[in-house]
Amino acid sequence: MNSSFYKRQITSFFNERTKYDNDFTYNRAIKLIDCVDLAQGETILDVATGTAIVAIAAAQIIGETGKVIGVDISPVMLSQATEKITEANINNIKLIESDIDQLDFDNNSFDTIFCSSSVPWFTNIPHTFSNWYCWLKPGGKIAFSCYSEESFLTPLIVELCQEICNIDLPDWNSITGTPEKCQHLLEQAGFNNVVVKQEQLGHYLTIEEAKNTWKGDRLWINPRGNPLIDLSEEQLTKLKSAYDAKIEDLATAKGIWEDITIFYVSAFKTSFKQK
């Protein structure tokens, strides 16, 4: 997939989320703070900071002697973040509008790096983790969240694409979709003491809500490609009909269960400087 086109898709997707904050998004993100110990005076990087949920909480813990840098690709999300930071009268957060892949911080710059629910969006996750390792000070830590490969109704769409159209639709969560995959990626980058905590955020959907999770269109924002764009209208219609029928088959008295298994992952850089 063309990288610049993909990044424009991501930016547009998040620019449309003008009311991002709610109980779900807040509670999901804020739990990252509990994954690592923060101290007064730390320098923190919050990757894909969004509306600064994590950045604000971290800034309040590290105090005025500390600093948080929040990076996000979406100007609309950063506008919401700026309003919240101003309202909270916080002065130790700097926001940067940028693709994190285009930034290059000095080695040993940060005590902690956070990233809430955004790692799967990155085009080269091993490279991203290697960068984070370099940017961290010796003894520094990272904390990020991601979802299991069984989360949401995505596996159903992927299965039907293979079964009906013989195409391999990439699952957004597949690269980091198990605790073992997360641990392997981090250890490859040099991290140690990897901890993966698992939590279930799933809920029941109505049949109509479940059907609307995929509208039968060609939209599929994924760094590993989008084979839906090559399908004919006839194929898309057939695929959508099969998806809706499968949803109806899965219905129970409570509705359609949408699994949302989230991993809260933390790890450390070795406490001595690498040569």
Predicted regions and their residues:
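Core SAM-dependent methyltransferase catalytic element
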Residues: 190, 214-215, 261-275
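Short glycine-dipeptide loop
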Residues: 64-65, 136-141
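A short SAM/SAH-binding and catalytic strip from SAM-dependent methyltransferases
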Residues: 112-125, 148
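C-terminal helical/coil "lid" or tail adjacent to the Rossmann-like core of SAM-dependent
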Residues: 2-3, 9-14, 195-254
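Conserved class I S-adenosyl-L-methionine
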Residues: 1-42, 53-57, 77-80, 88, ...
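A short acidic, Gly/Pro-enriched loop at the edge of an enzyme's catalytic core
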Residues: 101-113
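Class I SAM-dependent methyltransferase SAM/SAH-binding core
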Residues: 43-103
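Conserved catalytic/acceptor-binding region of the Class I
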Residues: 126, 141-206, 225-228
